[in-house]
């Protein structure tokens, strides 16, 4: 319900060659449609009874325009593979949909219901040791989000046939727990994997089924974590950790053409570099900086992505522009690390590479599991 005085976009909507809507300076009213709640990670609440022509428009609240807008510099995000859901019953008596593949995406529903009936899907990646639905593997309660990560889709039905899929949310899942009093006879549930458009560039197969499966797991891990930016997981944090990308970039380029996605992400890294050369461990930032944020932004391994990732892109493509775009960032990070190394005391300096060895400051250490 926010609106400013400066128009940034002019548009004309045409249907069958006829203009049905033209923007002007009077865009000063708003109305709420069927999407009642939405969050990119938490999920969506959709009231199908409100779908259709909107009435009762009301005024908007004006907000100051302080942002510099630029054109989109990424590849499209698409629905990719689709998987039909299989209804099953857990030992606890829960009704659960099994889509047969862990992915990042959402569920499309087709069902018949009475007006006002609800169906809720809670999405999760695995079943627990007893075969019951769980989200415990990715919950951290209030550390990142109050109450944890819901991964909830709720549909409030209209009378008769209902066809729904979310518009602005994706989640990591293979299973979905169903909560409803609707008769699901004849209902259809389809899971759509959603990720950036990246052509497959490599494949692998061998006589060892476990090794082949490991590679396939890596492929699906990439698909589940390359939705506009590379992230660490599609469920809990879903953050652009530099350390993860620094480790995965060579594999990612081998499996899929992720160059455009990573190129865009590097721009976020440049924007979030500190003046003294330290690198933000997460780009773009996902929350307000805490007291540990600035201290850990000198971490070797994580910040090294500033050099490792652009260089990997250059080696794979020969594109010197990626080096030109990121050279200043690379140089500043190198200078910062060299400065840390030169603070090492004479007593600590041993070996041929002593002058390049960092033994001071705060880094992610052995207490942090590998990314």
Question: What does each of the following model-derived ranges do?
Answer:
Residues 236-246, 257, 297-305, 325-328:
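Aromatic- and histidine-enriched alpha-helix N-cap/loop-to-helix transition segments
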Residues 251-275:
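Active-site diphosphate/adenylate-binding microenvironment
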Residues 264-267, 280, 324-331:
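Beta-strand segments within the central parallel beta-sheet cores of soluble alpha/beta enzyme folds
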Residues 247, 268, 329-343:
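Alpha-helical scaffold segments in carbohydrate-active enzymes
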Residues 247-258, 305-322:
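Well-ordered alpha-helical scaffold segments within catalytic/enzyme domains
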Residues 1-235, 243-244, 258-263, 276, ...:
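Extracellular/oxidizing-compartment recognition motifs
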């Amino acid at each position: 319900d926010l609106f400013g005085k400066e128009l940034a976009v002019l548009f004309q909507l045409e249907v069958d060659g006829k203009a049905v809507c033209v923007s002007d300076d009077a865009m000063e009213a708003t109305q709420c449609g069927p999407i009642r709640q939405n969050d990119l990670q938490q999920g969506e609440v959709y009231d199908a009874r409100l779908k259709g022509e909107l009435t009762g428009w009301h005024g908007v609240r004006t907000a100051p325009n302080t942002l510099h807008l630029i054109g989109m510099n990424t590849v499209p995000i698409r629905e990719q593979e689709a998987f039909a859901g299989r209804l099953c019953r857990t030992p606890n008596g829960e009704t659960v949909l099994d889509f047969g593949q862990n992915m990042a995406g959402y569920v499309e529903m087709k069902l018949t219901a009475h007006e006002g009936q609800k169906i809720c899907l809670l999405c999760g990646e695995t079943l627990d040791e007893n075969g019951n639905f769980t989200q415990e593997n990715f919950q951290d309660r209030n550390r990142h989000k109050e109450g944890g990560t819901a991964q909830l889709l709720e549909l409030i039905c209209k009378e008769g046939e209902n066809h729904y899929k979310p518009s602005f949310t994706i989640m990591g899942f293979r299973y979905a727990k169903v909560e409803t009093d609707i008769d699901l006879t004849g209902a259809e549930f389809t899971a759509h994997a959603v990720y950036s458009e990246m052509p497959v560039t490599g494949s692998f197969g061998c006589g060892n089924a476990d090794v082949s499966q490991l590679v396939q797991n890596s492929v699906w891990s990439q698909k589940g974590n390359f939705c506009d930016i590379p992230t660490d997981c599609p469920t809990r944090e879903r953050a652009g950790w530099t350390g993860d990308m620094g480790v995965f970039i060579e594999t990612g380029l081998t499996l899929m053409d992720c160059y455009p996605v990573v190129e865009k992400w590097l721009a976020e890294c440049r924007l979030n570099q500190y003046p003294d050369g330290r690198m933000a461990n997460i780009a773009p930032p996902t929350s307000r900086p805490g007291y540990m944020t600035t201290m850990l932004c000198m971490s070797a391994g994580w910040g090294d992505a500033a050099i490792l990732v652009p260089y990997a892109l250059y080696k794979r493509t020969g594109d010197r522009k990626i080096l030109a775009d990121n050279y200043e960032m690379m140089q500043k990070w190198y200078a910062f690390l060299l400065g840390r190394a030169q603070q090492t005391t004479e007593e600590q300096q041993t070996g041929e590479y002593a002058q390049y060895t960092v033994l001071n400051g705060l880094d992610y250490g052995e207490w942090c599991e590998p990314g």
